[in-house]
């Protein structure tokens, strides 16, 4: 599991479509252009919505310019965030993250009047504007935005919160990523002392050797415990930051901002949670079944991801690519073709290396740019599913290019449907190709 050939060696993304590197002069040029454009936009449109000086076509034109400006203003910070995810210990990248974040905040504060006016305008004043054909594609955005009206502050207060985030939430999130990316885990694997990344250690929890799994988990916890003071401070401050902002915005419940962003009613989430709780016995029966298949009386937490098939071989990254494209192709040739672009055009960073942030994600800037996927591929079946999952997001973004920028990002409950669907396609393909009941059992358990 720790041989280089399994770990997508050399599979890194190409970000040159955005910028050539952290020193690219186009970054500063775009930051300056965004600032200049935002000032001009504010001069042109401040007070126009509140004052009723825009008709439907005029508002659509303003929204279109706002989208174009947002694309330019977000590009430097988006690029910096991708660089940082791949190289959390690179000081030049860290500096770029801070520089672009500060510039993005300045630009956002110049533009915040626009969304505030869209939120504040009375329904009877807005309704006639929405009848213009040019406004049809912006109605969903406006409906979603205006749901936040009871929790929106004054322009000055919103600007202060944005500035506070530079040394508050955003700063603590970056500190966590830098600290996590710096951690190394020393343990013995197959008689050999190794220094592993967090992704490599977590991959060991899917090894058939129970002792190795327990050892890996112990080292993982102990290494983090060595930094418990900093980690505890980070988590507590993030919780307090969220609590304070919810109080300022007069939310009755700290989860309500998430529900609004996800465009889902709290009652729906509560109903789902209750349904899950009612079916706890089903999950418990699964765990009892897995314990029997593994030959244990009871499962430990380190057994949850243990493979049923102890002889299962690691999966090289090229084989994972073939499995994913084939499984997607059984559903749709277009699905498979889009996925192929991620592999062949270097839209994926899958290599395991020190300093890379943990976990996996798919990120997209705008309909004008293709998405990017990051993961750390260790050759497990779960890693194959993770790549498929993130490609589900990527394909969803790709197919959403016809949308306006303001409608481009899907709420979480919709976005995860696309990614889990991609995992289902992979699983169904593997089950269909399974040569024995034992293989099918290992896929299901």
Name what the model sees in each region:
Residues 289, 293-330, 336, 373, ...:
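Long, K/E/R/D-enriched contiguous segments that form extended
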């Amino acid at each position: 599991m720790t041989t280089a050939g399994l770990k997508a060696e050399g599979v890194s993304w190409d970000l040159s479509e955005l910028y050539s590197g952290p020193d690219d002069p186009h970054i500063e040029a775009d930051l300056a252009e965004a600032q200049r454009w935002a000032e001009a936009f504010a001069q042109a449109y401040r007070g126009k919505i509140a004052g009723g000086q825009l008709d439907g076509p005029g508002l659509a034109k303003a929204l279109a310019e706002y989208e174009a400006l947002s694309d330019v203003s977000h590009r430097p910070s988006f690029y910096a965030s991708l660089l940082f995810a791949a190289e959390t210990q690179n000081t030049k990248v860290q500096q770029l993250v801070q520089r672009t974040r500060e510039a993005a905040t300045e630009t956002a504060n110049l533009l915040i009047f626009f969304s505030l006016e869209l939120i504040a305008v009375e329904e009877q004043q807005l309704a006639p504007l929405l009848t213009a054909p040019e406004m049809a594609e912006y109605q969903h955005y406006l409906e979603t935005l205006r749901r936040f009206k009871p929790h929106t502050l004054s322009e000055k207060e919103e600007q202060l919160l944005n500035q506070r985030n530079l040394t508050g939430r955003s700063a603590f999130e970056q500190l966590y990523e830098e600290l996590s990316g710096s951690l190394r885990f020393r343990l013995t694997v197959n008689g050999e002392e190794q220094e592993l990344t967090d992704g490599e250690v977590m991959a060991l929890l899917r090894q058939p050797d129970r002792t190795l799994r327990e050892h890996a988990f112990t080292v993982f916890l102990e290494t983090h415990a060595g930094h418990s003071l900093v980690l505890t401070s980070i988590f507590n401050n993030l919780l307090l930051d969220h609590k304070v902002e919810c109080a300022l915005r007069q939310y009755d419940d700290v989860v309500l901002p998430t529900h609004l962003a996800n465009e889902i009613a709290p009652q729906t989430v509560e109903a789902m949670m209750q349904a899950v709780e009612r079916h706890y016995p089903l999950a418990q029966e699964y765990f009892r079944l897995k314990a029997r298949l593994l030959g244990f009386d009871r499962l430990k937490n380190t057994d949850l991801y243990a493979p049923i098939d102890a002889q299962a071989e690691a999966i090289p990254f090229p084989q994972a690519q073939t499995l994913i494209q084939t499984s997607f192709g059984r559903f749709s040739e277009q699905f498979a073709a889009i996925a192929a672009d991620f592999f062949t055009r270097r839209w994926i960073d899958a290599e395991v290396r020190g300093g890379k942030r943990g976990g996996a994600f798919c990120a997209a800037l705008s309909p004008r740019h293709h998405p990017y996927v990051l993961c750390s591929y260790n050759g497990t079946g779960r890693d194959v599913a993770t790549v498929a999952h993130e490609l589900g997001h990527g394909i969803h973004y790709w197919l959403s290019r016809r949308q306006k920028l303001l409608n481009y990002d899907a709420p979480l409950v919709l976005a995860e449907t696309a990614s889990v669907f991609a995992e289902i396609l992979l699983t169904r393909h593997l089950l269909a190709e399974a040569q024995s009941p034992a293989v099918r059992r290992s896929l299901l358990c």
